[in-house]
A protein has these predicted regions:
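N-terminal Rossmann-like FAD-binding beta1-loop-alpha1 element of flavoenzymes
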Residues: 2-28
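Short beta-strand to alpha-helix junction loop
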Residues: 54-61, 136-138, 149, 191-216, ...
């Protein structure tokens, strides 16, 4: 079978590797010069940076398995740390490396500054949603869900709402409670304590998957076409035509706005949310007290210590930050970080903005399935994995699913 995979992001990579491993003749077509999509490394001013700062969780089992499959060792490339959330106000919730659910119980019991009453209320709420299988009304927002549960205190401000924005890239007032519940189910609510671990890259994102996958695909006979933007898809006599070239099957693994341009029957376009990553380089001895910090500021959100004095500030969803120009944004973040940088100004900075970084994970959102109106055309991409918001794990799972569906139609 001749299979075209259109789009070389993480979903397209997963689809191409899965199909190639099964002996399929795969052609992977990517408009850019490298694989990786929105999670790739870029060279700027002689520095190798990530196109956007991403954090993986221990629950990303399919992502980790795919890394191993293409020869990228997660144990070497990722630093595994028990989940610990700290913010500038002094809030702290740290989970020990204990079996589940003891790790969560201890983390909640020792979280500060929280009243005993709030800890008990939260423990009962978490137990209740777990007993209900994390099922939530699909039309309910995260804010409405938290209101109904009486989650109105410190944990809402310092944990639930920041986690919501980080995981769904959508403010709690608009974000889907069902998707947020699914994230909690597979992390804090998982029966495996390691699922909550933070997996912090020791290297740039290109070396985690895109570059090893590119080598693996080439070594196993797949054709990689870079710099080719697909202009048309149309039904063929026995398959699908990609820019007039006949394939038995095709997997459309581009971002949804590009997929809809090629195949309008996919349906209505999504609303989108932006993400900015602000890279600030201070002196080499500058370091955060924690690898991950919630700035909890007027503008700043999450900060990741990349080592060697480089701090990556991640700003998700529409907010105060999105109306600031790059210079004003850098100056504001330098001010909010001054307690950790000794009032230094960054000697170098780079702001990377993605205006359509992810679909807006709103309540009641309808997501397309992998199947289309043409039996030989399948979709892949985080927007098609309806169980999750826009995550790398969702992208990987969608690509694997699309490849397996394509193989079943041979």
């Amino acid at each position: 079978m001749r299979l075209a995979v259109i789009g070389g992001g993480w979903a397209g990579i997963a689809a191409a590797v899965e199909a190639t491993a099964a002996g399929t003749e795969v052609t992977l077509i990517e408009a850019g010069r490298v694989l990786g999509g929105r999670a790739r490394s870029v060279s700027i001013d002689g520095r190798t940076l990530d196109n956007g700062q991403h954090i993986l969780l221990g629950a990303y089992r399919d992502t980790l398995a795919l890394m191993r499959r293409v020869g990228a060792d997660p144990e070497t490339l990722l630093e595994r740390r028990p989940l610990a959330i700290h913010d500038r106000s002094g809030f702290c919730m740290a989970l020990p490396a204990w079996p589940a659910p003891l790790h969560l119980a201890w983390g909640l019991l020792t979280a500060r500054p929280l009243s005993l009453r709030e800890k008990l209320r939260t423990a009962l709420w978490m137990d209740g949603i777990k007993r209900r299988g994390f099922r939530v009304d699909p039309d309910c927002s995260v804010a409405e869900w938290l209101d109904a549960a009486g989650q109105t205190g410190q944990l809402r401000c310092h944990l639930w709402e920041p986690l919501c924005v980080a995981a769904l890239n959508t403010p709690a007032e608009r974000a889907s409670a069902r998707l947020f519940a699914n994230v909690l189910r597979d992390s804090l609510g998982s029966p495996r304590s390691g699922d909550t671990d933070l997996l912090l890259p020791r290297t740039d994102f290109g070396q985690l998957l895109p570059q090893p996958a590119s080598r693996w695909l080439g070594q196993h006979g797949a054709r990689l076409r870079f710099g080719q933007r697909v202009r048309s898809l149309s039904p063929g006599d026995h398959g699908i035509l990609v820019d007039g070239e006949a394939f038995d099957c095709a997997i459309l693994a581009t971002a949804p706005q590009h997929a809809r341009r090629l195949w309008p029957e996919i349906g209505n376009d999504f609303a989108y949310e932006p993400i900015a990553t602000v890279n600030l380089e201070f002196g080499p001895k500058t370091a955060l007290p924690f690898p991950l910090l919630n700035l909890d500021g007027r503008v700043g959100q999450w900060v990741v210590d990349r080592g060697n004095g480089i701090l990556a500030c991640v700003l998700s969803g529409q907010g105060n930050w999105s109306v600031l120009n790059d210079a004003a944004l850098v100056a504001t973040l330098e001010e909010e970080l001054r307690d950790y940088t000794g009032n230094q100004r960054a000697g170098w900075n780079k702001v990377i903005r993605e205006q359509r970084a992810t679909f807006s994970a709103r309540s009641g959102l309808e997501r397309p399935k992998a199947e289309t109106t043409h039996p030989r055309l399948l979709l892949a991409g985080d927007y098609t994995w309806a169980d999750y918001p826009a995550t790398l794990e969702g992208a990987i799972r969608s690509g694997l699913r699309a490849a397996r569906l394509a193989l079943s139609r041979n």
